[in-house]
Amino acid sequence: MDVTDFYTDSWISDDHDGVRRVLAPDAEIDWNLDAPVDDEELVQTLHRVAAFADSVTVVARVRGADGTALVYDLVAPFGTARCAEFLSVRDGRISQVRQVYDLVAIDRYFPGLHRQ
């Protein structure tokens, strides 16, 4: 299992320690949510998604030389939101995380997720 698979499996299964284990200490993290982001906020937001979602499914994955691009379906009790994530890997750790959420669906199906 490569580091991006481990990261993905860890956050989907709500394994905080697994996510932290593969994030580089100086990882660059960026997203389109309102809240400022650092590694701890990323872990907490992934926890909130994993805890609230009925299921999280990887619907697309493209691997490149230094990372992976993923698209997730985040199924909530009343509908589905989508998230794209771009992961860069350096020295066996996730060095960059870029997340793009469908904010209209997130507000509708995961209320309060990004206005913490």
Label every PLM stretch briefly.
Residues M1-Q116:
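C-terminal and inter-domain tail/linker signature
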